Amino acid sequence: MKDALLATLIDEHATIEAFASLLAYEEKALVSADGMEALPQIVEQKTTLTQRLAGLEKARDAQLAGLGLPGGRKGIEMACDGDTRIASQWALLKGSTERARRKNLTIGMMIRTRMEHNRRALAILRGETGNGAMLYGPDGRLPAFGL
């Protein structure tokens, strides 16, 4: 049973590493001028990997239960106490997960910054700056010139 648990941890680690690679592609897409076309495929792949990780976590919890251990972090930490292979793989998985978490937070901040920038630019173009002048109308035309 411990061999199956080890195999699951190895699979989780590989999946997290694949997820982290996608995050790097996502970051590049967000900062490049023509990267928006790549985002739908990246999001689709991230969704697939997230679902795979959820399945692996369930498998890990079932394997822990088969060993008479509780699920989650507590159970895996208990499994690590008696097996250096599991402890080593768990440490790798935790490290990869933390790096992916930090990268995901960075990307989230990038997206929020871009959204705020776009919101402000639209407000200026719509004349929502307090001076009452509207540069562009809702249809994208210049109302002052009838264009």
What are these regions (language model features)?
Residues 77-147:
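Short terminal interaction segments
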